[in-house]
Amino acid sequence: MTSHLTERASVVIIGGGIMGCSVAYHLAKGGWTDVILLERKTLTSGTTWHAAGLVGQLQGSHATTAFASYGVELLQEIEAETGQNPGFRRSGSISIALNDERMAELKRKADFARLFGVEAHYMDTAQIVERWPLMNVDGVLGGIHMPSDGSANPIDLTQALAKGARLHGAKICEHVKVEEVLTSGGRVTGVRTDQGTILAHHVVNCGGMWARDLGRQNGVGVPLHACEHYYLVTEPIPDLPSDLPVLRSYCDGTYWKEDAGKLLFGFAHFHAKPWATNGIPESFEFDSLPFVEEDVMEVLQLAMNRVPVLQETGIRTFFNGPESYSHDGRFTLGEAPDRKGYFVLAGVNSTGIQSGAGAGKALADWIMAGHPTMDLSEMDPARIEDWQARDAYLQERCPETLVLTYAMHWPGRQRQSARGLRRTPFYHAMKARGAAYAEVQGWERPGWFAPDGVTPNYDHSFHRPGWFDHMLAEQRAVRETAGLIDYSMLG
């Protein structure tokens, strides 16, 4: 790919991972051919290249589920368009439950999937072990099977998008570092690179784990931080079924997929760590991180119990690589406030392969139409306050997002990290009265008050939580007599 730069473009895309290549592909396919993508090193060399490649359609919201569903459609079509095989295998997926709470959550997810026309159905233990014969089913209550899920090759998929972008007229330049996004009068005017300046009407920050620092130069908050993420690949396993479904054991914190006659299994860590707290090395390209055995031993023991063949199979690859996680588990996707023409797509929480095609299309459609073409409000960059893009906060908060990936997704679940940052003058007085605090945009706000003899801690449920009656009593007291409500955090 050429590194010769043009002087002007309608759109400059920064970052050659799956997100940047997806935006370029969908803009060019939509008729916007005056598009140039700039990559500091080589395509996929940041975090895309080492992704596990899982493709699961059911995500945490309507928008992200729509992204993933579209992604599966594109995976089945893009080879015919570009000649590049994305390595998609529609093996299906199975998610298992080891307790009643998890089983209830999986059944709720299956109901949610059906709203999108995604096939999902319950499997009992006998059916699960028939499809996943290597599993120890002790303690498994059942699971959910999604036949249209699968996996893809991250590099091949990204290269397919890049090839499609070029076929439709976009330009891709590697080994070009963007040093600054240029602005004037509250809107972008272009970018300054180490090889010259490009004037542009729109700039898209798809910088992955570099996106935060790039955005900070222009006062654009991109609340993400790189965290260490492990996976292991076994030696070849005789007679391993090639059509083995992707397996997710949320309670064990593990996911599994067949990988060319081997098993790849990764972890949603119980004790996640931020990476590059002093900055990402300038030379970073296709790099891996040191593998620290103590960081994964707890989850590895659970993995060996769940799939006993690990106890007698060698490990070929011990891998640790950086993945970007956001402060609240949501993407940052959209136009930055007060910076007309500055768009961001980053912080996708290790879902880039399954969400990249759809997220890139959503942003490309927004740029071409001049407005969002679907509800993307949950990802709005305007939700981010300045302090939420600061390093100290993100280094504490973002690893919790990784930890919670496979935790129970309770309604109203409270984060435990980076708490107590913003308090009103009434904080201590209300705490003395039994306030159980919840956090909203950093503010500690009483969710309910515990009566004498009750500890003010949240419990969680898909039904009425244990503190429901206490909250009901407060509501009645305010309705029938009087109450004091602290609104000082609203300014």
Positions of predicted regions on the chain:
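Dinucleotide-binding Rossmann-like beta1-alpha1 core, especially the glycine-rich loop
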Residues: 53-131, 251-256, 262, 294, ...
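Helical element adjacent to the flavin cofactor pocket in flavoenzyme catalytic cores
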Residues: 144-202
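Active-site substrate-recognition segment that forms the wall
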Residues: 26-29, 53-55, 73, 77, ...
